[in-house]
Amino acid sequence: MILERNEYPAVKRRIFCILTILCLTLAACAPTAPAGNGSERTQSVSFTDDLGRTVTAEPPRRVAALIGSFADLWQLAGGADTLVAAADDAWTSFDLNLDEDVVDLGGVKQINLEQLAAAQPDLVLASSNTAAQVELLPALEQLGLKVAYFKVAEFQDYLHMLDLCTQLTGDTDRFAQYGLGVERQVQAARDRADGSAPTALYIRATGAGCKVKNSRDSVLGEMLRDLGCVNIADSDETLLEQLSLERILQLDPDFIFVVMQGADKSEAQRALDHTLLANPAWQSLTAVQQGRYYVMDDRLYNLKPNARWGEAYEHLADILYPDAGQA
């Protein structure tokens, strides 16, 4: 999916100012490629990325991941020894035990171009679901950096990216282990759906407030749909624009799921309490009264589960279809 590009004049001015300096220094400061299996692979891989661009990449020796989940996925694909730079959530959210030489590129939405260029990656993995990273494309191309954009919102997206990455690393056994093996777990969870089509409300809470999410372009939303749930925001998109307790009470979903987002979950909890939970009417919801209100693990249901997709599906199936048994 290609996102609409917003204009960021300040960012563009900053990029223009640093491009000349960076281009002059790249050749002089190019570091030695780390040794690894990739040094023995010569066959290029061509594919269409999620911005619709044709990308042809040689097996990379130096990779930069502009989002932590992509750093995690690249490691799963057998590329740990070639990862030279990553966004800061690779440390704060994923605890990947990265080598001390891996460069911290800053926030996912504020990638440090100077640091990225100095790391001399021959492949950059970027998120097409992050507008600020899409906006960086002209600058990355002007710097001569090869970049591939991916959107991973559902399990099939993960399988697709893992397949491509294992082709690039040459470690196809990793796809069998972390792709096809996990797919069997996911399918077993799907098979437990009994056709009852339970209704669900999905709320994402942050320190800034709470938003209702539908089934599109979010990990938990896509997963609920895949397991046969009916997200009430799919048929009433006014909930996406303005969270309305009155409308939630009218629709009275069978299940309510909340994901707390942000480094300090207590801030998200306060926002949730203030917005919804403190209202006495909240307690009248069937899901609340019958114990079907769940706070879900941010790592599994907001960030990308990657190797834990099967675990995430199984836990959600346990909640939705407790009587279906394990496949």
Show which residues each predicted segment covers.
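A short, structured surface patch at a secondary-structure boundary
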Residues: A65-A119, L123-N129
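Alpha-helical, coiled-coil/dimerization segments enriched in small aliphatic residues
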Residues: A90-S93, V212-E241
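Proline-aspartate-enriched helix->loop->beta-strand connector
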Residues: L113-A126, L145, L245-V258
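Extracytoplasmic ligand-binding site segments that recognize negatively charged/polar headgroups
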Residues: A132-E135, K151-L164, A197-V219
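Structured C-terminal subdomain patch of bacterial secreted/periplasmic proteins
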Residues: L159-Q167, D173-A176, V258-A327
